[in-house]
Design a protein with these regions (language model features):
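A structural motif detector for short, solvent-exposed N-terminal "entry" segments of globular domains
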Residues: 4-69, 118-127, 135-136, 140-151
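Intrinsically disordered, low-complexity Pro/Gly/Ser/Thr-rich segments with frequent PxxP/GP/PP motifs
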Residues: 76-116
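The feature marks short-to-medium sequence segments in extracytoplasmic or secretory-pathway proteins
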Residues: 55-89
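A broad, low-specificity signal marking well-ordered, structured residues that form hydrophobic/aromatic
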Residues: 26, 64, 79, 93, ...
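Short, surface-exposed beta-strand/loop "edge" segments at domain boundaries and coil↔beta transitions
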Residues: 73-75, 103, 137-141
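Residue-level detector of flexible, active-site-proximal loop/helix-junction positions
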Residues: 35, 73, 85, 100, ...
Length: 151
């Protein structure tokens, strides 16, 4: 076992003993990066990202950001969450690429429908990476999707 692995294991074991939990349990659940059919402007809202609060605590997303591929260090497209958005346990947020009116739907689970207000697609059809940052710029989660081509 390497030193780095042993150190990581020690910290993990310590966290379980002390019942230390990560500050956020917001995950990027899904990226609908390649809606069926041609990429035409009336399909912008069929391209979306889904976040979910897997934790027990309500989390405010005010000032949080969602970006596409950050592997180059440059955030090409950045969505900033409005001050009014928070997710209770198991609630979801759908961030649609196109224009529209933001809304909240009660249900099981309840969900936000948020709109990036873009007039062109964000997520690459071949695949892309979505990264979520909190208001202080700390990386919260990241999800990469790849489109497999039939041979």
């Amino acid at each position: 076992m390497s030193t780095a692995l042993a150190h990581s294991t020690l910290i993990s074991d310590f966290s379980e003993i002390c019942d230390v939990k990560p500050p956020y349990r917001i995950i990027i659940e899904h990226i609908n990066h390649n809606p069926h059919g041609k990429d035409v402007s009336d399909k912008l809202n069929e391209e979306f990202v889904v976040l979910e609060n897997e934790g027990a605590e309500k989390i405010s997303l005010a000032g949080w950001t969602l970006t596409d591929d950050t592997t180059t260090g440059v955030r090409r497209h950045v969505y900033t969450f409005p001050q009014t958005v928070s997710l209770s346990s198991r609630e979801k947020a759908y961030i649609h690429t196109g224009p529209g009116e933001d809304s909240f739907e009660e249900g099981k689970p309840s969900k936000w429908n948020l709109h990036w207000e873009r007039h062109s697609f964000v997520w690459n059809n071949e695949g892309d990476t979505a990264t979520l940052f909190d208001a202080e710029g700390n990386k919260v989660d990241s999800l990469q999707v790849v489109t497999l081509k039939a041979t």
